[in-house]
């Protein structure tokens, strides 16, 4: 005997209602996954329990993309169908759309921070883990890139400083070499000034043949007598000129 058709109505028993919700939810998620795989369709499924607990399924964790596509499509369709006089209604719908989008972003942010994870299924947790891993890879890649660029910049600065130091060392060595040469030159000049002056050539006294050793020193004897070995001898020089002794001069001639 076959199973009878179940009548669709609200289950009054709270426990039975919760059990049925869990079973039907699992079957619904399974069907959504099957149709997305078999038909290569983009599927987005959102379910709220009677307690307000959220359950969702999306193809390849692209819930946001699917919802944005749905919103653009439905908004464009409504714009074509809605009359121009229904401007206020369109603004209200746009407000509701943006509000729902903000709520979705806030919920995803809480999930990324590790909050409100109790309502997520194992599949959703796995998708969230993959998203976080991908984000961490991007962060590490960017960090490594910045570190590599910083290291290259520091290496360039180090090379420039080394070249500058080499140039300064070369200039210092050249300057020291010049100063050393100048110091040696100054030392040589100072040694030349401190040496005693050279002796002049020896001057030989050239005596005139007429300047002999017997050169009389004329003198005047006042009131005395001039005595020689030979009192009567005449002093004779090399010119054969006789000099009268001074004492022979009569001093009386000077009296006048």
Curated annotation (Swiss-Prot):
Reported effect, residue 233 to V: In strain: cv. Co-1
Example of a GO cellular component annotation carried by this entry: nucleus
The entry's keywords: Activator, Coiled coil, Developmental protein, Differentiation, DNA-binding, Flowering, Nucleus, Transcription, Transcription regulation
UniProt-annotated location(s): Nucleus
Domain of life assignment: Eukaryota
Entry coiled-coil feature ranges: 88-185
Matches recorded under PROSITE patterns: K_BOX, MADS_BOX_1, MADS_BOX_2
Domain (K-box) ranges: 88-178
Keyword field contains Chloroplast: no
Effect on the protein of changing residue 100 to T: In strain: cv. Landsberg erecta
UniProt tissue specificity: Expressed in young flower primordia, later becomes localized to sepals and petals.
Disulfide linkage: none
Subunit relationships: Homodimer capable of binding to CArG-box sequences. Heterodimer with SEP3, AP1 and SVP. Binds AP3/PI to form a ternary complex. Interacts with the SEU-LUG corepressor complex when complexed to AGL24 or SVP. Interacts with AGL15 and AGL16. Interacts with TT16/AGL32.
Name listed for the protein in its UniProt record: Floral homeotic protein APETALA 1
Species this chain originates from: Arabidopsis thaliana (Mouse-ear cress)
Gene: AP1
């Amino acid at each position: 005997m076959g199973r009878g058709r179940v009548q669709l109505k609200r289950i009054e028993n709270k426990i039975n209602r919760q059990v049925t919700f869990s079973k039907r939810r699992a079957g619904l998620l399974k069907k959504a996954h099957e149709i997305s795989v078999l038909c290569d369709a983009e599927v987005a499924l959102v379910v709220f329990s009677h307690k307000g607990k959220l359950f969702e399924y999306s193809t390849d964790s692209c819930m946001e993309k699917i919802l944005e596509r749905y919103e653009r499509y439905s908004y464009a369709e409504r714009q074509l169908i809605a009359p121009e006089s229904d401007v206020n209604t369109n603004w209200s719908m746009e407000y509701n759309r943006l509000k729902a989008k903000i709520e979705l972003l806030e919920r995803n942010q809480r999930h990324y921070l590790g909050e409100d994870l109790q309502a997520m299924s194992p599949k959703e947790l796995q998708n969230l883990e993959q998203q976080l891993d991908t984000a961490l890879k991007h962060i590490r890649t960017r960090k490594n890139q910045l570190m590599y660029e910083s290291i290259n910049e520091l290496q360039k600065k180090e090379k420039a400083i080394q070249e500058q130091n080499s140039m300064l060392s070369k200039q210092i060595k050249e300057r020291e070499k010049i100063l050393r040469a100048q110091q040696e030159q100054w030392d040589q000049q100072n040694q030349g000034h401190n040496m005693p002056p050279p002796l002049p050539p020896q001057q030989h006294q050239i005596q005139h043949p007429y300047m002999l050793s017997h050169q009389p020193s004329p003198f005047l004897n006042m009131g005395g007598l001039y005595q020689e070995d030979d009192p009567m001898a005449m002093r004779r020089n090399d010119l054969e000129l006789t000099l009268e002794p001074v004492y022979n001069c009569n001093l009386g001639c000077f009296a006048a």
